[in-house]
Amino acid sequence: MKNKIKIRLKSFDHRSLDQATKEIVSAVKRTFANINGPIPLPRKIERFTVNRSPHVHKKSREQFEIRKHKRLLVIDDPNPAVVDALSKVDLAAGVDVVIELESGE
């Protein structure tokens, strides 16, 4: 029976995302667990075009974009020390973390 923990990290700022990834990887490596990653996932770019003027001048527009950066970490066959180390990691405020537990039978 092979268990896996998949950790997906999302952020608007790639620097804070890389810092959070380094903290998680170092915490897991201290428990001597096997970790794969960080795997950079494709970033998503959302673009918005809005009128500069509320009334006339349709051709005068402004464009904005939001870039969402993502990383994936996979921990193979985790032990309780890994879960304890992950719960103690303090991450930046702008990083969203999703943890999935996969059990292979």
UniProtKB/Swiss-Prot annotation:
BP-aspect Gene Ontology terms: translation
Keywords: Ribonucleoprotein, Ribosomal protein
Domain of life: Bacteria
Pfam families cross-referenced by the UniProt entry: Ribosomal_S10
Example GO molecular function: tRNA binding
SMART domains: Ribosomal_S10
GO cellular component: ribonucleoprotein complex; ribosome
Coiled-coil boundaries: none
Chain segments annotated as transmembrane: none
Cited function: Involved in the binding of tRNA to the ribosomes.
Assembly, per entry: Part of the 30S ribosomal subunit.
Family: Belongs to the universal ribosomal protein uS10 family.
Protein name, UniProt field: Small ribosomal subunit protein uS10
Organism listed in the record: Rickettsia felis (strain ATCC VR-1525 / URRWXCal2)
Lineage: Bacteria, Pseudomonadati, Pseudomonadota, Alphaproteobacteria, Rickettsiales
Gene that produces this protein: rpsJ
